């Protein structure tokens, strides 16, 4: 199991500068959560215990403001900024949380690990894992792409990906409550890179590949499966949407940035002893990744 080194301080400064001035958004905030409320949530996040959160009545802009305040603090605990994640990609997910469109959050690199991992089952207050896909940015031109084939020109690689999220909040949550928590991001596991080929064949493979989630302790029981086109009709449509949203927010993508494109399979709750395998059939070399969830550890609560 490998843990990546920190990214440059320059990238961390880019995030901090954006947040300090709230320069990433031009909209005025009506009731941005107080710093003390954000600090209270962060203290619970670090301990891995449930939090009160920011309340169900947050407006879209107030939720974004809370997200940026929280993101300013998260590098102390999760390492440097590694990229951005997309959530509420499917219509079902948006209906569940009352979201009108996809939403995005920040990702950090300290808990970004490779291929095979052993993770404590209680890695968060309300831990979940899901099958996902990420792309690695080649240049900022992705925001100008209009088709999957055009998008490939601005990407270096794609990678199967398992996100480790932590809802932190008990009970049903609104879309804005989740946005304020940086969309529950806590960590992730990725497979080796699949180099991008700027061809229609490669673009088609990204749309038609099938991901299967298997439980190795249950004789390979299938926990879920999906095609790539569950992500906004094509995963690269999701990538383009996210790049445009980031540009609108004043964020310029850099080479090496990672974009998480949303859940392919409904998130699952980990249990101690689970051995999960994700198979991505139809992608070049049909990559896989594995994770074992170990016994819970004592957080000293």
Residue ranges and their predicted role:
Residues 249-251, 260:
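C-terminal soluble interaction/assembly domains
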Residues 26-30:
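Sec/Tat signal peptide C-region and signal peptidase I cleavage site
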Residues 2-16:
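Bacterial N-terminal signal peptides that target proteins for export
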Residues 31-234, 287-292:
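Catalytic-core "active-site belt" of small-molecule-metabolizing enzymes
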Residues 16-24:
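Bacterial N-terminal signal peptides
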Residues 265-268, 282-286:
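Short, charged beta-turn/beta-strand-edge "cap" motif at the junction between a beta-strand
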């Amino acid at each position: 199991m490998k843990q990546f080194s920190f990214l440059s301080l320059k990238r961390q400064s880019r995030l901090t500068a954006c947040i300090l001035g709230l320069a990433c958004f031009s909209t005025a905030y009506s009731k941005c959560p107080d710093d003390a409320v954000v600090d209270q949530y962060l203290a619970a996040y670090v301990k891995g215990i449930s939090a009160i959160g920011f309340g169900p009545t947050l407006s879209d802009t107030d939720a974004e403001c809370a997200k940026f305040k929280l993101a300013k603090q998260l590098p102390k605990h999760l390492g440097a900024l590694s990229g951005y994640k997309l959530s509420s990609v499917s219509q079902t997910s948006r209906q569940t949380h009352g979201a009108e469109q996809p939403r995005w959050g920040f990702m950090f690199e300290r808990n970004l690990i490779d291929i095979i991992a052993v993770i404590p089952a209680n890695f968060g207050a309300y831990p979940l894992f899901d099958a996902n896909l990420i792309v690695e940015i080649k240049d900022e031109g992705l925001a100008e792409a209009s088709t999957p084939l055009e998008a490939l020109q601005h990407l270096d690689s794609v990678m199967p990906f398992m996100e480790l999220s932590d809802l932190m909040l008990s009970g049903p949550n609104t879309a804005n409550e989740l946005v304020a928590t940086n969309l529950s991001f806590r960590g992730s596991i990725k497979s080796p890179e699949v180099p991008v080929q700027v061809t229609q064949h490669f673009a088609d493979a990204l749309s038609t590949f099938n991901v299967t989630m298997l439980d190795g302790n249950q004789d390979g029981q299938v926990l879920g499966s999906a095609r790539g086109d569950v992500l906004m009709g094509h995963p690269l449509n999701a990538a383009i949407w996210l790049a445009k949203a980031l540009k609108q927010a004043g964020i310029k993508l850099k080479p090496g940035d990672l974009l998480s494109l949303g859940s392919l399979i409904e998130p699952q709750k980990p249990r101690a002893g689970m051995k999960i395998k994700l198979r991505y059939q139809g992608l070049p070399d049909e990559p896989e990744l594995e994770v074992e969830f170990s016994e819970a550890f004592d957080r000293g609560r």
